[in-house]
Amino acid sequence: MSKAKEKKEVTTNQGKKHLFGSSEKSDFILNMSAESAQKLCGVYSIIAVLVLCVITIPYYFTQNIKYGMDESVNRTLYLNEKFIFFISAAVLAVGFVGFIIFLIANMKKQVELKDNKSLIVPLAVVLLSVVSCLLSADIFTSFYGYLDRSEGMLTILGYWGLFAAGMTVTADDRRIKLSDFIVGIGAFEAIVGILQAIPATAKIVPNYFKEIFSAFSSGGMTYTKEYIATGFLCTPFALAAVLTVISAFALNGMLYDDKKARKIFYAISLALMTAADILACVVPAILGLGAVYVISLIIAAVKSGFAKDKKPFIACLVAFIVAGGIFAGLFAS
């Protein structure tokens, strides 16, 4: 090897750390650039959101597939009952990896634990779930979760990791891409929910919630078949919660983003999510969506007071009036 080449290799590796004295190839995490670290955080966050979106789809399409009988209570067992435990395990795995991503970002000084006090909030929820699990009548169900709820202690622990992973996305371009993807997921769930609420398409799009009490019909209980939006989130309450959060992304993106194409995308997505929230027919959807519009309207009013551009305030006011009119019309009917 020539002296020039040898000198070049020494210069390349100079000052770089290695895990356990290993080679450079095995410790890319320590040696990755700030841009590469942000790419890792951003890409993982998008993958995590995608996994959470599609993970319940098999649960929907296996709800009528029988695989056995529970002789002790003479109850038919369905394949979707098995998926609940896989869903909880998958959420935990995604959350665990998310927390590792957070630790990597902390190592790379992309995010500091001392500067992210908001992580205490989901941690408090985790601690409360531990107490709830220990005091529950059925610790097994409280730990793993069960049908139509699935939020056992393991699942909530996974959520904490997802919050931590989301905090690592600090670069503006990565945040915009993640926001675009989240709004796209919200629009997808909204479209599914709208199709579930239309009688003509409800037969094609599966909706577990509308059949949830059908087994009791023959036993004397009154069962009314309704067309209620749930998306692929099992219940209208879950759909309302998810769409409320994502609507905040869409509304403020529509108001303040500089690119016209993205404004249009956010506006269409917001309209779809508003419609799905209305068709969910639950009070949390109305309260949540109303809070999004009111808070965004206040922010737009404050910002417009210090700026010449009044368009965000006017757009938010129009959206608020239209949504309020739709809600009022539904209640009046």
Where are these regions (language model features)?
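Alpha-helical transmembrane segments of multi-pass inner-membrane proteins
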Residues: 3-8, 15-22, 33-54, 88-102, ...
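N-terminal hydrophobic segments of proteins, predominantly signal-anchor/transmembrane helices
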Residues: 47-68, 93-160
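Membrane-interface coil-to-helix junctions
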Residues: 69-86, 120, 125, 151, ...
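Asp/Glu-centered strand-loop micro-motifs enriched in Gly/Pro and often flanked by an aromatic residue
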Residues: 29-35, 74-82, 108-115, 166
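Cys/His-rich metal-coordination motifs, chiefly Zn-binding "fingers/knuckles"
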Residues: 1-2, 65
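Juxtamembrane membrane-water interface segments that cap and precede transmembrane helices
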Residues: 27, 65-82, 139-142, 216-232
